[in-house]
Design a protein with these regions (language model features):
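Membrane-embedded alpha-helical bundles of multi-pass integral membrane proteins
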Residues: 1-196
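Iron-sulfur-cluster electron-transfer modules
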Residues: 1-48, 52, 216-225, 251, ...
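Amphipathic, alpha-helical segments enriched in basic
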Residues: 15, 19, 23, 58, ...
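Short acidic (Asp/Glu) and glycine-rich catalytic loops that position anionic groups and cofactors
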Residues: 139-141, 231-236, 294-298, 314
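Ferredoxin-type iron-sulfur electron-transfer modules and their immediate structural context
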Residues: 147, 151-291, 324, 334-353
Length: 355
């Protein structure tokens, strides 16, 4: 409402056009002021945690450079916008008290009124300059920040709700079933199935197993990559990361988003068509070492406040490595061979288990 009023006042030339709402308007403006103060307090808390206390999850390698600058810039921008709002109201309240022309008696200023002693000695002309300057800087700051929003991690304030809504309803820890593999297994186990019933010419191309690049991701996984808040709770809970492994669930989502951005620029350059650039998400952004460090404990999924599932992407990429590249680690191949031959992951027969 406050922003809408500022826009309408700027277009029409009025001042506090919603003042006709009376008591409701006063409650709204007062609530905005309290909210602005709480936002500033929260921002200071977040800044201290990030830059002074230096919590470990904010000091990980993936947050070096532009990611850290982006997070701090957002804090500075929001603080500036809130301070301009309060200073604008402070000057407005003083102008109302002085019965300045065009400044009708409207609004309730519980926070700004405490700042009036800082400017009560200023002339009406100076107060008008302060109020108008803060008005312009406030609206320009909001418009600039809204444009920057789509290029920063702060986009999560728009995407968190839809991402949570579209999150999987499967029990946590349950993996999705690959229908192509299921159909193949059913065909092998069905004694009445005719493997030659479908000719080669009429057969559909086999579905790719797993994920190699972002073009293989589902739209929900793409949404999750942009929803990531980079808070690091997932990485903070990851046992692989805590024991010094290269894996960071947060980095998985950040690298996925970086690759999506790169593919998007490629499509823009080639007029809506993707031209192969010799890169893929698997290998150029996310390494096999990261994938196989995952213990599939699901801690990252449970820790995420906006229902992002890094584990699903990790497992899909593992599936591609194993089923498309035959690149499973030697230890995994040995275990599978033992299960096939001995009915257990250990390298000795069933008859020797009790010895």
């Amino acid at each position: 409402i406050e922003l809408l009023e500022i826009v309408i006042d700027g277009i029409v030339g009025t001042h506090r056009i919603f003042a006709v709402l009376g008591t409701f308007y006063n409650i709204v403006i007062g609530s905005f002021e309290v909210l602005a103060l709480l936002v500033i307090v929260a921002i200071i808390t977040f800044w201290v945690r990030r830059n002074l206390l230096k919590l470990s999850r904010f000091q990980k390698p993936e947050l070096k450079g532009s990611a850290k600058k982006d997070a701090n810039f957002i804090l500075y921008a929001e603080t500036t916008i809130m301070l301009l709002f309060l200073l604008m109201n402070t000057a407005d309240a003083q102008l109302q008290a002085l019965n300045a022309p065009h400044y009708l008696q409207a609004g309730y200023f519980p926070i700004s009124s405490m700042l009036i002693p800082l400017i009560d000695s200023f002339s009406v002309g100076t107060l008008i300059i302060i109020e108008r300057t803060c008005w312009w800087l406030h609206i320009i700051g909001i418009l600039c920040f809204l444009n920057y929003l789509y290029y920063s991690k702060h986009l999560h304030i728009l995407l968190a709700f839809p991402n949570t809504y579209f999150a999987s309803l499967r029990p946590m820890g349950a993996f999705k079933v690959n229908e192509a593999i299921t159909n193949e297994v059913k065909l092998m186990l069905n004694p009445e199935a005719d493997p030659f019933a479908t000719t080669t010419e009429s057969a559909t191309p086999p579905e790719k197993f797993g994920i190699q690049d972002v073009t293989d991701l589902t739209w929900v996984q793409l949404l999750s990559a942009y929803t990531c808040t980079e808070c690091g709770r997932c990485t903070d809970e990851c046992p692989a990361n805590l024991t010094g492994k290269k894996l960071s669930p947060r980095a998985i989502m950040m690298k996925t988003r970086d690759r999506i951005e790169e593919v998007g620029r490629n499509i823009d350059r080639h007029k809506g068509k993707f031209e192969a650039d010799g890169k893929t998400l698997l290998g150029d952004y996310i390494t096999a070492e990261e994938l196989w460090a995952c213990t599939t404990c699901n801690a990252c999924v449970e820790a995420c406040p906006v229902s992002i599932n890094p584990l699903e992407i990790i497992m899909d990429m593992r599936q591609y490595v194993v089923m498309e590249q035959s690149g499973a680690p030697n230890e995994l191949n040995m275990m599978m061979n033992n299960i096939e031959n001995n009915g257990a992951p250990w390298a000795y027969s069933q008859a020797d288990r009790l010895q």
